[in-house]
Amino acid sequence: MPLANGCICCSVKDVGVAAIENLMEQSGLFDYILLETTGLADPGNIAPMFWLDDGLGSSIFLDGIVTLVDAKNVLKSLDSGVGDEENIEKRRQAQDHDGHGPLLTTAHLQISHADVIIINKTDLVSEAELEEVTQRIRSINGLARIKTTTKSQVPQLEGLVLDLHAYDQVTDADLQFASKGHSHLDPTIATSTITFPTLNREQVDKFDFFLRTILWEETLTGHVPFKPFEIHRLKGRVPVKDGRVLITQGVRNLYETNEMEDVAKDGSGNGEAKLVLIGKGVDQEGFRKSLYDTLGL
């Protein structure tokens, strides 16, 4: 399947989907489809077409996003955008950026969208440097699982690169690291967690209204002042007083909320709800105030 510039993006998504459908019709079902992008690809442009495309729903689903990080050079990529100048300039023009302030590099986008992050070439850095890299990555994406390797060798594929089921459910363990709050180690992208009480039925609709507003309209509900923001990933786990547990997943402006399976086994029909946001400007206090005002808390 030849791809222009080595990647699939929004401008050719119909071609990419049709090519995979045609391949499966000719060769039958595959156990797994691993789509490898170039080093300058934006996962946010690719993931939604596999995650929510109804035409592929019966045979293909998005299992997860894996990002490979160069331990030796990733900080340089995040801080100065080395090798990413053209994409950075395009983003600045699209957002009418004046050239000042933190850079939004492709490295930021690839880390912020990931479900698993593999830090490679760890043999080329010291323990202190590796810790700095790990903390910087964690500040950008507090939800992703992080694994360190040398020469891209991972101990096993299943559960780390394959069979992630990253969009099937959201557990307390998934949100554990992010629940400590947001970090300011990276000036561009942050992970922020909002906690709130168990919802009643009426508040469930209000919660959905809040999600639609921040993702589709890129604004906050009510009259809460805010600075411009950009949400890359969203995960939520919301217990409801009637015993249900709702899980929410989002990539860019697309999201879905489903009822968790096996709630009785999980034993978590009650308790604290959590909403985790990853993106640009998501660490402002206005998000929490807007959600609480919308829910009437």
Model regions: which residues?
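Conserved strand-to-helix beginnings and helix N-cap segments that scaffold or border functional pockets
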Residues: 13, 44-47, 127-131, 288
